[in-house]
Amino acid sequence: MRKELQLSLSVTLLLVCGFLYQFTLKSSCLFCLPSFKSHQGLEALLSHRRGIVFLETSERMEPPHLVSCSVESAAKIYPEWPVVFFMKGLTDSTPMPSNSTYPAFSFLSAIDNVFLFPLDMKRLLEDTPLFSWYNQINASAERNWLHISSDASRLAIIWKYGGIYMDTDVISIRPIPEENFLAAQASRYSSNGIFGFLPHHPFLWECMENFVEHYNSAIWGNQGPELMTRMLRVWCKLEDFQEVSDLRCLNISFLHPQRFYPISYREWRRYYEVWDTEPSFNVSYALHLWNHMNQEGRAVIRGSNTLVENLYRKHCPRTYRDLIKGPEGSVTGELGPGNK
């Protein structure tokens, strides 16, 4: 009887020690990636399955709540896909701050299918037409470098690995059924805020060649939507859209503006208004919130019943619960290169 009691106490003690050990690890490393995620390399993660790609080309480490919502909504809509967030401020030796310091980053790192990687442009641009351009450029002297470096990186990543690139002010609401596609911002005009291709698609290779040949940092969008549009015109005979139907050209789909831009950039403030009857967005796959237009700092406010608050509540509920405050402590979506 005594031996059984001793054995029982020993087992209980071991269990308690194990629990305390795990608790200590979690308490001191709330921001760290789970071990099963930290050992997965980029190539292994993206080489055999499609993924969703986000970029942060500034040095900031704490994603604004709109970035958090974009990543969370993508992870929710594509639960079987890796959602990869490249961050310039993150390195292999970056010390992991506490949960209280960077709550959004900590939350995103804990989502099962979200993976955070350092943005190493030199490595990403290797074996592409952009590599020699990058080695010759003086980034500090370039206008709009954060946006241009983002434009270059997204082309190289999707060309190498395939998948879907999204700006960090895009809220996913349903899966995109296309493999090779561009998103129309308007008739005969393509955006580069969201696009998807299979690996090594020649359209993206030609885009990278044109990026270098016609590089001009003084022209806003020249390496971004203007590039996509002029290359699409080379590949396809563009026509006006008829109703809500997409255009097909070779093996590329040019998706109707309603798919991602049902509210145009001229009307971006409508996201921050209360609607009598909210739109269903039943033909849209994702919503681009035009955060770059939000120079006046319009905020997402808990309890406001604005369209954007209700989108957060439905499509990124954890971000809404943890990061969105009431009128006394409202926060805006900070501007960044990935939310144009």
UniProtKB/Swiss-Prot annotation:
Instruction: Give the residue spans that cross the bilayer.
Output: 5-25
Tissue distribution is: Detected in stomach and pancreas.
Q: Which domain of life is it from?
A: Eukaryota
Enumerate the glycosylated residues: N99, N138, N251, N282
Q: How does the record classify its membrane topology?
A: Single-pass type II membrane protein
> Biological process (GO) annotations?
carbohydrate metabolic process; epithelial cell proliferation; glycoprotein biosynthetic process; negative regulation of epithelial cell proliferation; O-glycan processing; protein O-linked glycosylation
Gene Ontology cellular component terms for the protein in this record: Golgi membrane; membrane
Q: Which residues lie on this side of the membrane: Cytoplasmic?
A: 1-4
Coiled coil (residue ranges):
none
**Pfam families attached here?**
Gb3_synth (PF04572), Gly_transf_sug (PF04488)
Residue ranges, Lumenal side: 26-340
The answer to keyword Kinase applying to this record is no
> GO molecular function of the protein, one example?
acetylglucosaminyltransferase activity
According to its UniProt record, where is this protein mainly located? Golgi
Task: Let me see what the UniProt entry remarks about domains.
Answer: The conserved DXD motif is involved in enzyme activity.
Q: What does this protein do?
A: Catalyzes the transfer of N-acetylglucosamine (GlcNAc) to core 2 branched O-glycans. Necessary for the synthesis of type III mucin which is specifically produced in the stomach, duodenum, and pancreatic duct. May protect against inflammation-associated gastric adenocarcinomas.
Which protein, by its recorded name, is this? Alpha-1,4-N-acetylglucosaminyltransferase
